[in-house]
Each structure stands twice: as structure tokens, then as C-alpha cells.
């Protein structure tokens, strides 16, 4: 309960700060002029669109690939696959975004590819861990009941691994929200346009006008995904977690 109070208070503070800065007409005439509400809302929408598109692609790649490397015929690929994704995230986000520009050109596609690379590891790693850590006795029991490999995956493994997979998606989403600030450097849209305008013009309030809603967006999406994670967790797993 206390954690939720802290999150809501922080979110209210960030939103209040954003509203206050955006409604300022001037601070020292000719020195500071905030971005208009229309610019702020359009940038927020573009930022959210980039994050959601990158996450959908990262999920479509990371979850199946994480499951695939748990299978007997593909376990030898675990180290190179997880290791490759780890290398992708260990490289600074600015470097990845800069690399995409000469490869794919400036524009939306370069930003999306960079965000997918940077957000893939948590989803891939948690998908692998969620499936790999399931008690083999459960899988054997399902196989003994005559279930096929596909049925075991859909009806047994995925429901049990879902909380771990959702945790990876939540972490990836929060990372992507922050990384998307830099997408403006390769022609992407989003709140990074406001933040970097403040950086280049040395206006702290303009930086806050872009950074505060970005932080609020990360907190909001993280909270929503955490609630979805709890809702999708099987009741038996919740009871087991409370007893442990």
C-alpha cells in the first residue's frame, strides 16, 4: 500500500510540474518560452506510439525465441542468443541509435530498430527463465496425460511462466520509454525533441518540460503492466508466493 502511495504521489508531482511549466507565459522576457500544450500532447502521443510499436516487435521476437532455446534441439543456442542480446543492451543507447542512422537512414524506422534492440534482452531472458525453471515433473505429468508438445506449451508452460515473462515486458517497457528520448537524434519524434531543445538552448525548465512527462509515462506504464502481471498470475502461484 505504501508503495502505491509513493508512486501516485510521484506521478502527481511530475504531472503538476509539467502543467506548471507549460502554463508559464514567460520567465524573464525573451529568455524562456515553454512549448505549447499542443506540442506537448503531440510529442507525448508520438513517444507512446514509438514505445508501443517497439515493445510489440520485441515481444514478437523475444518470447518465441526465449521459448525456442529451452527446447532440447536448440539448447546449444542459449548462450549465443542470450549473450547477443546482452551485448545489444550493454552498448550505450546513444551508440545504438547512432549506428542505426547510417545503416537505415534518418527516420522513424531507425528509431524503432534501435529501441527493439535495446528492449529485447529483458523479454528474451525472462521468457527463457520462465519456461526453463518450470518443474520437469509437471511437464512429464502433462505428457503422461497424452498432451502434445504444443498443448503442453500453451496450457501448462506459458501460464506458469507468464508472471516472469510479464515482469520482463514491464522492465523492457520502462527502459524503452527512457531510451526513446534519444530517438529524436535519428529523426524520430517524441518527448526527446522537447528535452534536447532544452539541452541545446541550456534551458533547465524546457528540459524538465520534456523529462517530467517522460518519467510520468514510465511510471504509468510500469504500474499498468504490474497490475496486468498480477491479474494474469494463476491464483495457486499467488498463494504459493504468499506462503513462501
Residue ranges: model-predicted function:
Residues 60, 84-90, 100-103, 113-127, ...:
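Hydrophobic transmembrane alpha-helices
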Residues 191-232:
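Hydrophobic alpha-helical transmembrane segments of polytopic membrane proteins
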Residues 42-54, 101-122, 162, 206, ...:
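Loop-to-helix entry region at the N-terminal start of transmembrane alpha-helices
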Residues 131-137, 141-161, 187-189, 200:
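Short helix-to-coil transition segments within interhelical loops
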Residues 61-67, 110-139, 162, 169-177, ...:
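Membrane-embedded alpha-helices of multi-pass transport/permease systems
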Residues 1-56, 230-244:
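N-terminal, non-cleaved signal-anchor transmembrane helix
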Residues 65-100, 125-133:
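Cytoplasmic-entry segments and transmembrane alpha-helices of multi-pass inner-membrane transporters
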Residues 117, 149-183, 209, 213-214, ...:
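Transmembrane alpha-helices
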